[in-house]
Swiss-Prot record:
Residues 14-30 have a biased composition (Basic and acidic residues). Signal peptide: none annotated. The lineage of its organism: Eukaryota, Metazoa, Chordata, Craniata, Vertebrata. GO terms for cellular component: cytoplasm; cytoplasmic vesicle; membrane; nuclear envelope; nucleolus; perinuclear region of cytoplasm. Coiled coil: none annotated. This is Gametogenetin. The gene is Ggn. Residues 192-202 have a biased composition (Polar residues). The modification Phosphoserine is found at residue 399.
Length: 673
């Protein structure tokens, strides 16, 4: 896994990848470390800067930077060979590959984290972990989760071996820290990842790398001790793996520093051994997010460098987990990238996580802001249902910080959406045309503009639930029957045509129904409708209502940002005419008769529009848009093909023609069979 990830990373050469590589290297090394020989420890120390844990999955390039030759090839191998204990000291040595020369190379990636010597290690660790998580690279990300689990499983094994390698006190210290720290799970994960890789390969690479590293790094007498220490820490706990990931920092770890936890060893000079990769638990994104925060880096296996950054590591890890893998969220598939322990302990619950894609959905977010408009405007299914779906996806979209706010806004609007959307979706009942629904409540849209007319008070009650209008509805049976939400429209219509049911009703229905469709409108309908119902004046009231209705619709449109009426018109051509003509007339103050006639004649409720087309057949005389494709029509009506071939033959041919995209196929031509 590490190898695969590392290769893509190597190509990219991104810091993330490098960090990932380091993390993987460090993890793997610990796995092998228990078996590492004293000489191997020395080599490892020599390589200390470039050491990477076997378990960590990251581009080998990152760790390798210290030793581009050895690290690039060996790193992948190491990644591939995750055997925790099998890797020989050579592997440890490879892990410790002297990164001083490569450090410069690595610096681009680790420099950030390495800047602080003390905190650098934890930070690098975090980076490694982050990369391991796959924050930086999707490839690493995906494999990482599995690796963490594996590491977790094998961690106990590593821990058991660790005690024997305890020869180095510092190493011993490191193991305790891992035990204490939450990062242990990370180390375990790393170990698992390491185990996943074949031990032999890992060992071979490590040995070759270790030897090379030993030669390169040789010159630090305490290297052997350091190596042992690293080995002990690694074996003791998956945590050591992180420790092992010594740093790639240019400065070699002095033996003294090596004595300290591996992280310390990697870094007094390495700046905390930016390479210090904690278990793959920390995602690159996470590390970056936490930035210089060494604790985040410390998150790794709980190694505590002499600086005692590790203790922070525990906290940072918890914090990161709490944040839901900030890095992860920030990165791309944050949740998946988070190591298994992190994922289990702290799912990135705030937002659903899509392993492959960014959680943010720009198309989803805007609805939040405009949700009302869209909902009201598109209450009809297209927008409403999708909106709800968006709600489902809402959590994942958007970055973690916004997720709280987003969630609430989404939540609020969405919750209303189901109730409001369902009713308003197709609230315009055909009955409204001829039959003025007497429900007194004015249309919701009318209600908002109610301010101009005396019924303005009802406008204030818009909060009233849409259900309220239903009770007031008098003879809006058609509307009521049409739909539960219909009551709202019914009220609107009744309000429009309380006195002139037939004349005003159509107009009201046309103008108000669209308005009613919006959830807001529906909500407003109850109080407004009731208020208007109370004062149903014959003509004056009618006019007022009529004016109100169109005005209300306009007002709603303005308020919603999407006109309840306007959007409806575009959505449904028939509605546009009725709304536009009737509603426009009403609002303009066109004679009630004119408005009513228009509305009555052509008020097509949005839901009705689909079925209301006068074209009842797909015959040849129909215009082109209504005609069926030649092949379909031929299939449906075959005057000459009655029984020449079994029906299934025609079906097969038709299916074939459709699949092939043929515009026409001859039913008779190929019936030879």
């Amino acid at each position: 896994m590490g190898n695969v990830q590392s290769e893509p990373s190597a190509g990219g050469g991104s810091r993330k990848e490098q960090a990932s590589d380091r993390a993987s290297d460090s993890r793997r090394t610990p796995l092998v470390e228990p078996e590492v020989t004293p000489s191997s420890p020395a080599m490892r120390l020599a390589r200390g800067l470039g050491v990477w844990f076997p378990g960590s999955s990251g581009p080998p390039g990152l760790l390798i930077p210290p030793e581009p030759q050895a690290s690039s090839s060996p790193l992948p191998l190491t990644l591939e060979l995750p055997s925790p204990v099998t890797p020989p000291p050579e592997e440890a040595a490879a892990v410790s590959t002297p990164p001083p020369p490569p450090v410069g190379t690595l610096l681009p990636a680790p420099s950030k984290w390495r800047k602080p010597t003390g905190t650098s290690v934890p930070r690098i660790r975090g980076l490694l972990e982050a990369s391991h998580r796959g924050q930086g690279d999707p490839p690493s990300l995906r494999p990482l989760p599995p690796l963490p689990r594996q590491l977790t499983e094998k961690d106990p094994v590593l821990r058991a071996p660790a005690p024997p390698p305890t020869p180095l006190e510092p190493r011993k210290q490191l193991p305790p820290a891992p035990s204490t720290c939450d990062p242990q799970p990370l180390s375990r994960r790393i170990t698992l990842a390491s185990s996943a890789t074949s031990p032999t390969e890992s060992q071979v690479r490590h040995s070759s790398e270790g030897q090379a590293a030993g030669g390169a790094h040789g010159g630090v007498p305490p290297q052997a001790g350091e190596g042992e220490m690293a080995r002990s820490a690694t074996s003791e706990s998956g945590l050591s793996l992180l420790c092992k990931v010594t740093f790639k920092s240019g400065p070699h770890l002095s033996p003294t520093s090596a004595s300290g936890p591996l992280a310390a060893k990697a870094s007094p000079g390495a700046g905390g051994g930016g390479l210090f990769a904690s278990s793959g638990a920390i995602s690159y994104a996470e590390v970056l997010k936490q930035g210089p925060q060494p604790p985040g880096a410390t998150r790794p296996l709980g190694e505590v460098p002499p600086g005692a950054t590790r203790p922070l590591g525990e906290v940072p890890r918890a914090a990161q987990e709490t944040e839901g893998g900030d890095g992860d969220g920030e990165g791309c598939s944050g949740p998946p990238s988070v190591p298994a322990p992190l994922a289990r302990a702290l799912p990135p619950p705030p937002y659903t996580t899509f392993p492959g894609s960014k959680p943010k959905f720009d198309w989803v977010s805007p609805p939040d802001g405009t949700e009302r408009h869209f909902r009201f405007n598109g209450a009809v299914g297209g927008i409403g249902a999708p909106r709800r779906r968006t709600t489902t996806l809402s959590g994942p979209w958007g970055s973690p910080p916004p997720r709280s706010g987003q969630t609430h806004p989404s939540s609020g609007p969405r919750r209303p959406t189901p109730a409001l959307l369902a009713p308003p979706m197709f609230i315009f009942p055909a009955p409204n045309n001829g039959e003025p629904v007497r429900p007194v409540p004015p249309s919701p849209q009318q209600i908002p503009p109610l301010p101009p007319p005396p019924p303005t008070p009802p406008a204030t009650p818009p909060p009233a639930p849409p259900p309220t209008p239903q009770p007031p509805a008098l003879p809006r049976t058609p509307i009521l029957v049409a739909r539960p939400p219909t009551p709202g429209p019914g009220h609107l219509e009744s309000a429009l045509a309380p006195t002139p049911p037939s004349t005003l009703s159509p107009t009201a229905a046309a103008d108000q129904v669209p308005a009613a469709t919006p959830a807001t409108v529906t909500s407003q309908v109850p109080a407004t409708a009731t208020a208007e119902l109370s004062p149903p004046m014959p003509q004056p009231k009618t006019r007022t209502r009529r004016n109100k209705g169109p005005r209300a619709a306009r007002g709603v449109i303005r308020e919603e940002g999407t006109s309840g009426d306007g959007p409806r018109e575009p959505n449904t051509a028939p509605v546009t005419d009725s709304s536009s003509g009737g509603g426009g007339g009403g609002s303009n103050g066109t004679s009630t008769a004119g408005a009513s006639n228009k509305g009555t004649a052509r008020h097509w409720p949005p839901f009705e529009v689909l079925n209301s087309c006068p074209c009842k057949c797909y015959c040849r005389h129909q215009r082109r848009h209504r005609r069926l494709p030649r092949n379909v029509s031929a299939w449906l009506s075959t005057p000459t093909n009655h029984l020449s071939e079994p029906p299934w033959v025609a079906t097969v041919k038709l299916a074939g023609s459709l699949v092939a995209g043929l515009e026409h196929y001859d039913l008779q031509a190929t019936h030879s069979t």
